[in-house]
Amino acid sequence: MGDVVADALEKLSADQIEQFRKYFNMFDKEGKGYIRATQVGQILRTMGQAFEERDLKQLIKEFDADGSGEIEFEEFAAMVANFVVNNENDEGLEEELREAFRLYDKEGNGYINVSDLRDILRALDDNVSEEELDEMIAEIDADGSGTVDFDEFMEMMSGE
């Protein structure tokens, strides 16, 4: 088992591994111990996991290095972990950012003004210059409204 697979499996709980095994077995009907690489997307959809087709293709390429098209359970679990663990982390990050946003959105009107944003950015990095702050704020508040809504805030904080 490669390092990439071992590292990914370490991040999974016993419950997650058991769940992945059930889905894997649903598609490995003959008990061969592997599934076709082309089935991974179907399984992710069955699990209700969102994914980008290009990300999936890249992972399959990474885990099916010999190009055989056969994915064993450990490889499958490691691949799926990339989607499940990342999605859970994204949800946690979004909730944390939403909470931080609410702290600065004192009136509860769905936006914060750029002076509050300046305070947030300065708190995150006290070495940032006024010029750098101006540049960051201009980029974040692209429409020049003087306010930042949650989506703009989320994009800035998560880099997405």
From Swiss-Prot:
SUPFAM superfamilies: EF-hand. Pharyngeal muscle. This protein binds two calcium ions. Ca(2+) 1 binds at D64, D66, S68, E70, E75. One of its GO terms (cellular component) is cytoplasm. Residues 15-50, 51-86, 92-127, 128-160 form the EF-hand domain. This is Troponin C, isoform 2. Keywords: Calcium, Metal-binding, Repeat. GO terms for molecular function: calcium ion binding; troponin I binding. PROSITE patterns: EF_HAND_1 (PS00018), EF_HAND_2 (PS50222). It comes from the Eukaryota. InterPro entries: CALM/Myosin/TropC-like, EF-hand-dom_pair, EF_Hand_1_Ca_BS, EF_hand_dom. The gene is tnc-2. Ca(2+) 2 binds at D141, D143, S145, T147, E152. Pfam families: EF-hand_7. Belongs to the troponin C family.
